[in-house]
Amino acid sequence: MSDYVELLKRGGNEAIKINPPTGADFHITSRGSDWLFTVFCVNLLFGVILVPLMFRKPVKDRFVYYTAIAPNLFMSIAYFTMASNLGWIPVRAKYNHVQTSTQKEHPGYRQIFYARYVGWFLAFPWPIIQMSLLGGTPLWQIAFNVGMTEIFTVCWLIAACVHSTYKWGYYTIGIGAAIVVCISLMTTTFNLVKARGKDVSNVFITFMSVIMFLWLIAYPTCFGITDGGNVLQPDSATIFYGIIDLLILSILPVLFMPLANYLGIERLGLIFDEEPAEHVGPVAEKKMPSPASFKSSDSDSSIKEKLKLKKKHKKDKKKAKKAKKAKKAKKAQEEEEDVATDSE
């Protein structure tokens, strides 16, 4: 019995023991690591389910699946890294709200997970791309939205790693970039969405309401009391961040798939035809083209034009011949009438 108990003890989460948080006064414990592993499992589960479902669809219908699989897999990697107590640096806190009895300096050093921000950099653009696709937003506008989203993640990464109050400058720039993306989606994209029907507009408004609440209210609040303001312990911070990340970067992208299918993939313009390759295998030896091949390379439209011109030319020729014959017959008739008149 004692051996069984020892085995169970050894089978627990030992990430903190194997990868100790050396140099950090405020860091996650085994409880925080357990929660991070839970979020990792949810993200990975969605990815594992969606990949086989994607392969059941034709290649041209898979783009919607890509937009849901990508953020889940990216965040699963980020959360596995954080749960393993890796991908972090100790940063001296600016504010002395959280304290421990073992810290040597005040404020102490807080554990900052840069792995989270790397995950955001890779995953955050996908919900924005999904919203852009609902309205058929032009490609360059989508690229602009994605670029501003990346500015948000980079600014917050720098803000989390900076000790001085200059961190709030990067924090503000990041929020500004997020606001610009939301304005772009609620103006340019929403005008395009309205043209596609009320049902598409309702889906867009619902999704954007959730995204804007989480992005412009929940995330700034969370950062302000965790990595920025050092108010919450890292364990509490992982729970706060984990819930928001699951909602915006995991659940929303997955929900987009059935809704897109309900609205109609073709209607949303999310079907991409791919022509099969003409040549497979070794490249054949090139030969000089013959004159006949140049003739056969004419486009269908030019051939049709030539045929039409030929037919028209033939018709005109026939009409001219008929007119000539009629003229000759008329002339002969007039001559006969003149001869008859002279004989009388």
From Swiss-Prot:
InterPro entries referenced in this protein's UniProt entry, alphabetically: Arc/bac/fun_rhodopsins, Yro2-like_7TM
Pfam families: Bac_rhodopsin
Residues in cross-link Glycyl lysine isopeptide (Lys-Gly) (interchain with G-Cter in ubiquitin): K286
Biased composition (Acidic residues): 334-344
GO terms under cellular component: cellular bud; endoplasmic reticulum; mitochondrion; plasma membrane
Bias-annotated ranges (Basic and acidic residues): 297-306
Name of the protein described by the UniProt record: Protein YRO2
The organism of origin for this protein: Saccharomyces cerevisiae (strain ATCC 204508 / S288c)
GN (gene name): YRO2
